Amino acid sequence: MVKEYKGSHSGEHGDGIVRSEFHKKMFGEKITNAFEEIKDTFDKKNLLNPGKIVRPYKSDDRSLMRYKSNYKSEDIKTNYDWSEWGNFSDAIEMCNNNGACRKLDSGVMCPSYRVTKEEKDLVRGRANTLRLALSNQLPKDSFVSKEMYETMELCVSCKACQRECPMSVDMAKMKSEFLSHYYKKFSMSIKDRVISNMPKLIWLLKIVSPIFNKIKNLPVISNIIRKFGYATEREMPTVQNQFPLKEIYKSQIKSENKVILFADTFNINFEIQNLMYSIKVLNKFGYEVIIPSFDNDNLKRPLCCGRTYISYGQLDKAEEELNRFVNYILVNGYYDMPIVGIE
């Protein structure tokens, strides 16, 4: 039909395996033979993309495909709900190898690849490694292994892939799922343990904050934290006094329209200006702001979104934090109150 109506069987994506076998029908034997002569002149050993355009493979040859006739992926027990895709393996297989994550110009995806230029540090590389492990094409127990950890390690969980990948592959969520299995078999490093438990450890830092803020950028401190695996190219954050924030909070407008401002661990301890400006903006729109733990709500420590736990696969602890937040809403009767978070 395409030939009858003088159409083209290929376009911007080229010919490849799918269309090459139809060249003789479309172009005729004379032109097809000319293609072969050009190929043989410049590529005598047939090294450059063999089986495409010239002397093509059959498009339905399963031996050429990632999914062979005997392909079967393992349906493992997961901590996240992957039913939207079928299961975890099906979600991984959403990566169709289009390579959009290899771009170096616009957008954000994929930050680790933009630095290393290595396929293994790419969304596609990680997805393929996970897929090969769960379809038993890698050595036994490869899914929960140190090699898989190395593959996933440089993913910064920015979720750019979920936004910019044509298939919306969510590698940040997949990494979190992987780590939830990995840390049941292997112990966490001190560095990862400190960051993941920051919501519970921050009170220790606050006790020594006057001293910490003065010495944190000294060379001797940089040498110490480097040994634990932290990057020293950036300055360590300053632990901030919450007094200015509490002053603005107490002096804000009173209104029937109330909103909960979720003061996460990092904003309330290291970047209180974000919360201060947020209160002012919300007040301008006629909202009175409620910050959990700043009122008489009997919280032993500030509420936490569980983000650090999620990033390190500590999903049981993340669930604990989310349950604390739900309980806070229920106890105080804030069922219909809007919740604002700061990214």
Question: Which role fits each region the language model picked out?
Answer:
Residues 2-5:
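Catalytic or ion-translocation cores adjacent to nucleophile or general acid/base/metal-coordination motifs
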Residues 8, 16-154, 172-173, 177-187, ...:
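Ferredoxin-type iron-sulfur electron-transfer modules and their immediate structural context
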Residues 139-343:
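Iron-sulfur-cluster electron-transfer modules
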